[in-house]
From Swiss-Prot:
NCBIfam families: lysogeny_AimR. Transcriptional regulator which is part of the latency-replication switch system that decides at the onset of infection whether to replicate and lyse the host or to lysogenize (latency) and keep the host viable. Activates the transcription of the aimX locus. Transcriptional activation of aimX seems to lead to the productive viral replication (lytic cycle), aimX possibly acting as a regulatory non-coding RNA. This is AimR transcriptional regulator. Disulfide bonds: none annotated. It comes from Bacillus phage SPbeta (Bacillus phage SPBc2). Homodimer. Interacts with the viral arbitrium peptide, this interaction changes the oligomeric state of AimR from an active dimer to an inactive monomer leading to lysogeny. Coiled coil: none annotated. InterPro entries: AimR-like. The gene is aimR. The keyword Signal does not apply. Keywords: Activator, Latency-replication decision, Transcription, Transcription regulation. GO terms for biological process: latency-replication decision.
């Protein structure tokens, strides 16, 4: 018997009113499906969200333990297992996901097999095991049949473009996703909808459509209880306010920080965001990470040194960065910082060039503002912003 059934039965012995509470949390019209679930091993709910919501409300500190045990005991040929695969990926529970992927690929159910193969490509692309070209080629060979994987095959490419700073293809690709085709599995449809909201908020941020950016982030927050999506929604709202409202940007970053205290990776993301915010506004910066050698953290070290006229230290860091391989978006920031240090117009124009190559219409403001201060033609700068 799975751990979740054992835990629920034990709690019911002490408080039988929990049955009605759980039915409400699970979105059930009455407790009957709960009785079936508790009294028949292998029985699942019609929608995966029911078990997720019960675990989150009753056992929040044991979610990973209970859901791992539950997911890995599911028959991989079922709708519940396919939902579990999306649950694992959405929550970045990769140990659960990888076991499910391997089991699904080798199972006899064609639908589950297709899910396994598509999510396998997603994992390998995310981990740089394969290139974008190889991913697209393998997806094409699958001749995808299910509407869920038709959508996810596009979502996985969108995540790749976002992570590599290649924003140019994203707006057109996301238009190809039609979630109305998904009718069998509402859990997957709803999580994919949240994914689309989060991705759209990033697309709108990089298009400099900031009101729309915040609207998509708010839709994501309203539609999910998944920490990952909540975190990146607060992050994007904060980023959208980066140049216009220091206090509100900081407020959203701190909200994200507060909900991610137990997640080291998310905690680091918000510390980096708060660091960048303080550097942009040229404030005292307690968020600098002097222990890290990542490109982002090194750039923010240099950024802080430049703000406080510690030019020799800034140059030392930028010289170190010159030896590292950057993507276009990172190069844009690198040239912006060199321009700040040297008061060099050519560097600011190089920064603009690379922001344009990565299609980042938001952070391109950084070099444009510096050129404006240097007296460059305002009309020219407005044209460069297009």
């Amino acid at each position: 018997m799975e751990l979740i059934r054992i835990a629920m039965k034990k709690d019911l012995e002490n408080d039988n009113s929990l049955m009605n509470k759980w039915a409400t949390v699970a979105g059930l019209k009455n407790p009957n499906p709960l009785y079936d679930f508790l009294n028949h091993d292998g029985k699942t709910f019609n929608e995966f969200s029911s078990i997720v919501n019960i675990v989150k409300s009753q056992y929040p500190d044991r979610e990973y333990e209970l859901m791992k045990d539950y997911c890995l005991n599911l028959d991989v040929k079922t709708k519940a297992a396919r939902s579990a695969l999306e649950y694992a990926d959405a929550n970045m529970f990769f140990e659960i996901e990888d076991v499910l992927i391997d089991s699904m690929i080798s199972c006899s159910n064609m639908k589950s097999k297709e899910y396994g193969k598509v999510y396998k490509i997603h994992r390998e692309l995310s981990n740089s095991v394969i290139t974008e070209f190889e991913a697209v080629k393998r997806l094409g060979k699958l001749n995808i049949k299910t509407p869920e994987m038709n959508s996810f095959s596009r979502l996985l490419l969108l995540y790749h473009y976002l992570s590599t700073g290649n924003f140019s293809p994203m707006a057109q690709l996301i238009k190809q996703i039609d979630l109305s085709e998904i009718s069998e599995n509402m859990y997957i449809r709803n999580t994919y909808q949240t994914r689309v909201h989060v991705l759209m908020s990033n697309i709108k941020l990089n298009e400099n459509s900031l009101e729309e950016c915040r609207e998509y982030s708010k839709k994501a927050l309203e539609s999910t209880n998944i920490l990952r999506f909540q975190v990146f929604s607060y992050l994007t709202i904060g980023n959208s306010l980066l140049f216009s409202n220091y206090e509100l940007a900081q407020e959203n970053f701190l909200k994200g920080l507060s909900i991610s205290v137990q997640n080291e990776n998310y905690n680091m993301i918000f510390q980096q965001a708060l660091c960048f915010l303080n550097n942009v506004w040229r404030k005292e910066n307690k968020w600098i990470n002097f222990e890290s050698d990542s490109i982002m953290d090194l750039q923010e070290q240099a950024h802080c040194f430049i703000n406080f006229n510690e030019n020799s230290k800034a140059k030392e860091v930028l010289d170190k960065l010159d030896l590292l391989v950057h993507n276009d978006n990172e190069l844009a920031m690198h040239y912006y910082l060199k321009g700040r240090l040297e008061q060099n117009k050519a560097c600011f124009y190089s920064s603009i060039e690379y922001f344009k190559k990565s299609n980042d219409k938001f952070l391109i403001r950084l070099p444009l503002l510096e050129l404006q201060k240097m007296g460059e033609n305002q009309k020219l700068l407005e044209l460069l912003l297009l």
